[in-house]
């Protein structure tokens, strides 16, 4: 039966898409830099960045060129073969980090799934089949597959799907004593976000991460850093572990890695990687030439002094605006995070209303995020212009006034 061609509107979403999202009422159709336009031509300043993904803004010329060039050359061949863009990107990541081996996937979930499987398998073949315990943290977020959502410490995402993978223990974030209480020689891995993004934009303390490193060494467990949201320049270092001076055994990256093109990576050492062999894990699309070509172009720009050394000044620009808004409207109890991953916690009288501020922002022409019901989150382009920060925060101030005055 022929399908009648009708206009695409927000109502179309409710008619055809699985109801796992509740998207905004407007549909973005064009982006350039830190600005977005919807179907009606309304302009928005983008401080959401596709949830910390569009690290170089929308339609960056270098990324567009990389995509067009690769798109005219080779799209897909699977991992029955390798390809030049994947090998180039792998070499760049290894040369810039602690890692000696890398594997590419398509999403943060897949990178974390790979990391958790590797940690379990490494413990099994190198130590004992009973060394299976994974220690993770309350309010963590590691993905949506059954394994990764179970390692994530938020029951609202993991309950209701039947039996969960076993031997996963959650303890409070930044509480080293709680980790010590459950850590033993049956532990195969400790999994942690250096900055909890979805969990409220809460940064780990240096003492906490250093303590985790020492405990993992003591119990022959692997330290896994999930840098899906906080990595690729967002903190002002290429990866957050560099800021802390604590080197993990396994690191995962996604989001900003592709600048908007779906791609992820898991990085580790040669010795740990050797626990896997052909067939241990895999992906049809992982390491896709299109994705890796775009990611390589993004990497070449992000991993430069011009970008990384400008992050802190841009952060301060945001913080200055947030402090002025707070002085005027008395709305934030804390402004936190690191680099251009910024959280603004709402005061008690506004608890649970983060989405009200988000929706008001959209009405005023600025796109922001929430991190739970009580925290506003900002994850803009790493090269956002000062004029965009000023204009976007001016609009956000109007949004705050609207909510506070409601």
Swiss-Prot record:
Keywords: Amino-acid biosynthesis, Aminotransferase, Arginine biosynthesis, Cytoplasm, Lysine biosynthesis, Pyridoxal phosphate, Transferase
Span of the signal peptide: none
Transmembrane helix recorded as keyword: no
Cofactor: binding details: Binds 1 pyridoxal phosphate per subunit.
EC number(s) given by UniProt: 2.6.1.11, 2.6.1.17
Family listed: Belongs to the class-III pyridoxal-phosphate-dependent aminotransferase family. ArgD subfamily.
Note: The reaction catalyzed by ACOAT is highly reversible. This enzyme may also transaminate ornithine.
Protein name stated in the entry: Acetylornithine/succinyldiaminopimelate aminotransferase
Highest taxon above the source species: Bacteria
Cofactor: pyridoxal 5'-phosphate
Subcellular location: Cytoplasm
Residues found modified as N6-(pyridoxal phosphate)lysine: 255
Gene Ontology CC terms: cytoplasm
Principal place of residence: cytoplasm
Residues that hold N(2)-acetyl-L-ornithine according to the record: 144, 283
Pfam family, one: Aminotran_3
Species name: Escherichia coli O6:H1 (strain CFT073 / ATCC 700928 / UPEC)
Record GO biological process: L-arginine biosynthetic process; lysine biosynthetic process via diaminopimelate
PROSITE patterns, per the entry: AA_TRANSFER_CLASS_3 (PS00600)
Residues that, per the record, bind pyridoxal 5'-phosphate: 108-109, 141, 226-229, 284
GO molecular function: identical protein binding; N2-acetyl-L-ornithine:2-oxoglutarate 5-aminotransferase activity; pyridoxal phosphate binding; succinyldiaminopimelate transaminase activity
Top-level enzyme category: transferase
Role this protein plays: Involved in both the arginine and lysine biosynthetic pathways.
């Amino acid at each position: 039966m022929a399908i009648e061609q009708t206009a695409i509107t927000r109502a179309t979403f409710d008619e055809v898409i699985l109801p796992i999202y509740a998207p905004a009422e407007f549909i973005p159709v064009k982006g350039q830099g830190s600005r977005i336009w919807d179907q009606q031509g309304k302009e928005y300043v983008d401080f959401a960045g596709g949830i910390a993904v569009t690290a170089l803004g929308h339609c960056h010329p270098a990324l567009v060129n990389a995509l067009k060039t690769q798109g005219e050359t080779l799209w897909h061949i699977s991992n029955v073969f390798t390809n030049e863009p994947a090998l180039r990107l792998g070499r760049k990541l290894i040369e810039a980090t602690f890692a000696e081996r890398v594997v590419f996937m398509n999403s943060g979930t897949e990178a974390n799934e790979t990391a958790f499987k590797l940690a379990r398998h490494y413990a099994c073949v190198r130590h004992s089949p009973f060394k299976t315990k994974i220690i993770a943290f309350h309010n963590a977020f590691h993905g949506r597959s059954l394994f990764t959502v179970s390692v994530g410490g938020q029951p609202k995402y993991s309950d209701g799907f039947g039996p969960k993978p076993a031997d996963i223990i959650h303890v409070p974030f930044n509480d080293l004593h709680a980790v010590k209480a459950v850590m033993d020689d049956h532990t195969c891995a400790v999994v942690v976000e250096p900055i909890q993004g979805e969990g409220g934009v809460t940064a780990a303390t240096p003492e906490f991460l250093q303590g985790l490193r020492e405990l993992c060494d003591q119990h022959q467990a692997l330290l896994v850093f999930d840098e899906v949201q906080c990595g690729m320049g967002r903190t002002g270092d290429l990866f957050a572990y560099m800021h802390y001076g604590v080197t993990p055994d396994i690191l995962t990256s996604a989001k900003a890695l592709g600048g908007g093109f779906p791609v992820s990576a898991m990085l580790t050492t040669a010795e740990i990687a050797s626990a896997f062999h052909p067939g241990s894990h895999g992906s049809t699309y992982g390491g896709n030439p299109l994705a890796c070509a775009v990611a390589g172009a993004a990497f070449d720009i992000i991993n430069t002094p011009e970008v990384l050394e400008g992050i802190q000044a841009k952060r301060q620009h945001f913080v200055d605006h947030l402090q002025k808004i707070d002085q005027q409207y008395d709305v934030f109890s804390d402004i936190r995070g690191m680099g251009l991953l910024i959280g603004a916690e709402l005061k008690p009288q506004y608890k649970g209303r983060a989405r009200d501020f988000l929706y008001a922002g959209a009405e005023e022409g600025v796109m922001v995020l929430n991190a739970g019901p009580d925290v506003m989150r900002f994850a803009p382009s790493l090269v956002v212009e000062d004029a965009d920060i000023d204009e976007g925060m001016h609009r956000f101030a109007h949004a705050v006034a609207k909510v506070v005055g409601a």
